[in-house]
Amino acid sequence: MKNLDNVKRIADDIKTITIQWATNIAREACKIMEQELRNWKFESHDELSRFFNEASQMLIDARETEPLLRNAMKYAKSKLKKWENANQIADAFREYLWWIEREEDIRPKIWAEIIHNWDDVFTHCHSKSVVDILLKARNDWKKIHVYNTETRPLYQWRKTSLDLLNAWVPDTMVVDSSAWFFVDNTLWNTVDIKEIFLWSDCIKPDWTVINKIWSFSIWLSAWNSWVPLYVVWSLLKVDTTDKVWIETRSGKELRPEAPDWLDIVNFAFDRIPHKCITGIITEFGVIRPENLMREVKKHYPWMLE
């Protein structure tokens, strides 16, 4: 078996969050797989397959809930079944990287058109993709004001706010617990929210969206007050497995001195029903949730194999 030290180093960096964010994780995993496949000489297809399977599984196990990473390995494996040349498998990883870069470039240019001049926009947690759309709208000379949550316990809003303020986009932080009330224009209309943009940590085949905790309450308020809610997502990040896993955080985060016999429920994520999502903003346009798998089959059929 070929040496897997370089792959293990990247896997360890992913596991310890030295490498973080979905796109960065997938990008580094693809790069190391391409590098190692080109560097090693394989004597047979069986040897190539063993190396690929062990290396790819090591990377997947480092962040098993990350579909963009898992789909990268799935795409390359679909080519492994057809080709025997390691360089061709490496080319598959390079192609996947190109898809990621294309998606990041195309989406903000097209779907910033959803935002209109003078709109008050709301977002939750931090997402570079969401920020890119907001900055593109600003670069198109649209005067917008962004409201975003604090996003406890890691306070990702600080990154969102810094990116926006550095680009001279007016920004206001809203505490998590009042976000649902803030966005409901029927209960409190001092600020008239026009659109809500949410990132997603996972979209399932049944169109369910899994995202940072408080997303469900924000969705419920948007539904109640007819505020359009968009999920910013790439088809490459659709999780085609049936497994639904909602991450929880330690109860010690809330009460470090809590007695051992006290159970504390501390969800890190929740679920957004698909029925009132206005659209999913993808690299192929804004699509309705119920059309999600049809678009996956059309553009990335290997994901459903």
Stretch-by-stretch model annotation:
Residues 127-139, 219:
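Histidine-anchored nucleotide/phosphate-binding helix
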Residues 23, 120-121, 125-131, 153:
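Gly/Ser/Thr-rich loops at beta-strand to alpha-helix junctions
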Residues 54-81, 92-96, 100, 109, ...:
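Non-catalytic, soluble scaffold/interaction modules
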Residues 7-16, 54, 90-94, 141-146, ...:
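Glycine/charged-rich beta-loop-alpha catalytic/anionic-binding loops adjacent to active sites
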Residues 149-305:
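Conserved phosphate- and dinucleotide-binding cores of soluble alpha/beta proteins
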Residues 74-117, 135, 144-192, 196:
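Ligand-binding beta-strand-loop-alpha-helix segment within the catalytic cores
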Residues 1-89:
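Long amphipathic alpha-helical segments
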